[in-house]
A protein has these predicted regions:
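Chalcogenol-based redox active-site neighborhoods
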Residues: 1-148
Length: 148
């Protein structure tokens, strides 16, 4: 019944699954477009405007310049609507896009799906491989230390 709680994140070193989704700004984003150019942080979080989710996303907001300096793009990911994401982003001055994960399609690819999205952070290298994968709320500095 609760097997979904115990699934592991993707294995570090493996190729990250490609995905495509719209962000809160209406732009179409895919992992493939970053390959060879940028590392990518994916912050999977359950819901906009909840206490822990807001703290986690704002921690990455506060480290955004460090991510940019490491040629790393940051994306929040959850199944909330584009409108919810726009309001959340505006309220908290988020400098990075939030992806609309309809039907938890991206979450399924990254073993984060379930009745609620499992809080997980990934860093995908410029080579398309998983460099960092951890459930919970790892510090942005720990995550970004693994960037190419």
């Amino acid at each position: 019944m609760f097997d979904w709680l115990w699934s592991d994140p993707l294995i570090v070193g493996n190729e990250a699954p490609d995905f495509a989704a719209r962000d809160d700004r209406g732009r179409f984003v895919s992992l493939r477009e970053h390959r060879g150019k940028w590392s990518v942080v994916l912050i999977f979080y359950p819901k906009d405007e909840t206490r822990l989710c807001t703290k986690q996303v704002c921690d990455f907001r506060d480290s955004w310049q460090s991510a940019e300096a490491r040629e790393t793009r940051v994306y929040g990911v959850n199944p909330d609507s584009a409108e919810s994401h726009r309001k959340f982003s505006s309220k908290h001055d988020l400098p990075f896009p939030l992806l609309v994960d309809e039907g938890q399609r991206i979450a399924k690819l990254y073993n984060c799906n379930g009745p609620i999205v499992k809080r997980t952070v990934y860093l995908i290298g410029k080579d398309g491989r998983v460099k960092f994968a951890r459930r919970g709320t790892p510090s942005p500095s720990v995550v970004l230390a693994t960037a190419d």
